[in-house]
Amino acid sequence: MIRIGQGYDVHKLAYDRELIVGGIKIPYEKGLLGHSDADVLLHAITDAIIGAIGAGDIGHFFPDTDMAFKDADSAELLEEIWQKVEADGFRLGNLDATIIAEKPKMAPYVEQMKLRIAELLHADSAQVNVKATTTEKLGFTGREEGIASLAVVLLEK
């Protein structure tokens, strides 16, 4: 059996926050604003995985109204979901994700993100692809107001 899921997330850039994308701290004057650490890439991946198993969305498991998840490490949230997925007998076929940001440039960090995500999903790095793009200064990402991410995951049983 194969299952496909897709995920999307967006967070606003704000001062006085660390920028964490794909589980990697990126030096920048702003970070992403959110209830947790606001890791936009890991949130999109987590949502894609939850979608692939037909279990709703990330907000169902980790509501932003629950103080237990205040400033939560998104890598730990992904690991919690992945444990459920593995317990159900699924493994990663492949994952493809895109980060959409005007600044900072993500390309120097993509390989580190790929390795970290593969580690979190107990997968080979060849099963994980992460890429970065801009919107050519269009929209909220182009105006440097926020960062978005998309993810597609294939699970196999």
Curated annotation (Swiss-Prot):
CDD domains reported in the protein's UniProt record: MECDP_synthase
GO biological process: isopentenyl diphosphate biosynthetic process, methylerythritol 4-phosphate pathway; terpenoid biosynthetic process
Key word Lyase present: yes
Pathway entry: Isoprenoid biosynthesis; isopentenyl diphosphate biosynthesis via DXP pathway; isopentenyl diphosphate from 1-deoxy-D-xylulose 5-phosphate: step 4/6
Residues annotated to bind a divalent metal cation: D9, H11, H43
Database matches in InterPro entries: MECDP_synthase, MECDP_synthase_CS, MECDP_synthase_sf
UniProt family annotation: Belongs to the IspF family.
Record HAMAP family: IspF
Quaternary assembly: Homotrimer.
PANTHER family in alphabetical order: 2-C-METHYL-D-ERYTHRITOL 2,4-CYCLODIPHOSPHATE SYNTHASE, CHLOROPLASTIC (PTHR43181:SF1)
NCBIfam families linked: ispF
Listed name of the protein: 2-C-methyl-D-erythritol 2,4-cyclodiphosphate synthase
Organismal lineage: Bacteria, Bacillati, Bacillota, Bacilli, Bacillales
